[in-house]
Every structure is written in C-alpha cells, then in structure tokens.
Amino acid sequence: MPPVTLADDLAYAVSFPTPPRRVVSLVPSITEALATTCPERLVGATDWCTHPSDLVVQRVRGTKNPDLAAIRALEPDLVVANKEENRELDVGRLRADGIPVWVTDIETVPGALDSLERLFTEVLQLGTPGWLESARAEWGGPVPEPSIDVAVAIWRDPWMAVGRDTFTGDVVARLGWRNVLAGSSERYPHVELADLDRDGVVVLLPDEPYVFGPDDGPEAFTRARTALVSGRLLTWYGPSLVGARAALSAAVTG
C-alpha cells in the first residue's frame, strides 16, 4: 500500500507509510473508542483514560503534561490528540521527533462522529464501528426546540460553567434543553453563583472535571433545581454516546 497523507481536523497534513498499528491516545474519549474497536492497536494512554475500566496499556501521564519520553519509548506510528485537551507544545515536540500526531477538534456531536469516522476509516483503515452507527442513529436528526432551561456547572470555588461553542453545549441542545449561558463570550466562563441559581433553571452537576456529589454542590442552590449527572455521558464522545440520551434525560426530567 502506498503512503497516505491526510489532513487532520486542524488541516495539518499527516503522512502514514502504512496503516497505524501502534497508537497512543492522549484523549480519554478516543481511548475508549480505540479500546472498544481495535484494542490490539492501542499501546498507550493517559492516566485520565478511565474507560474501559479494565484497560491495560502503558500510561503516559496526563493530558496536559504527557510523558514524552514514555511516548517515544513506545515507538508509536500514531499519537491521537485533541485541540482543547492537549497542548500544542507537546504536539509540536512529538512531531519534531518524527511521530505522526493526529489532532481532533470537537465542538458538536455530528462533528465528533464525523471526526471519529475519519480516524477509523481513513487513518486506521478500518470499517465504521457499530457503536458509531448506533450513536448516529441516536443523536441524528434536527435540534429540537428547547423545553427546559439548564446551566452546566463544571467547577466551584470559583464557579465555572459551560458557555458557547462546546461539545457539551451541543449535547444539551440536542436533548431539547437551552443552555442559559450559551451567549457567553467564553467557552467556559467564570460565573457567580447567582448566574446559575435562578428560578426555572435546572443546574446540571456532573462528576467531572469537578466531582460534584450529593453533599458537594446541590446545597449551594436555593432557587434552581439541581441534577447530578454523569460527566462522561455529558462530555465524552465515542461509545459513551450510545445510551447517553436516555440516561441524561432520565437524570434531569425523571
């Protein structure tokens, strides 16, 4: 097979002499997707790559501080990164060592599924995974008119929330909910508690990145209703999208 050159999500040309067989993933969502689809090709992942729970690969530290020496030692023919989750500096250093790095850029559910399909079919030269087809069926169709106002908290002390142009925001919209902070000038703005604690708003409290729980989060709100939700279902793209619609809807609307 002749070498293939493809443009990643940031339009960077990445050359592959052969379909990659030794893959390091720096993105938890994509690690789960790879481990579910082609586990024999996945040789390294970050400490934050928690799914599947029985994943056994070399760990290469965190998403923001990967152990570049450990990655090099694995002799990967592909490293998968993400514009938001990983540092451009680390991507550049790996590329300078001659390692192909494929960078994804995810802001919507359809965009995530398209990006993952390209990764599996064009880069890895595999077929479309069954879970991806199921996710398309579950999340396809037009965005419904919103019926519930929500805010998505991601941190406290200081409070932060989901703002504009995010994957999570698109998930929320496709569930038929209106993110009351979607008009923010920032993607993840710092906010005052009063910006979230409003009459008629449901505040979603996920368990990542901040670990909200029954005794840490709901007690701060006196006006808004709160709902503890799975951060993975709300923020990860990949196999976790299958079944996420029903689970998130049940957590919020009962």
Regions found by a protein language model. Give the residues of each.
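N-terminal ligand-binding lobe of clamshell/alpha-beta domains
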Residues: 1-254
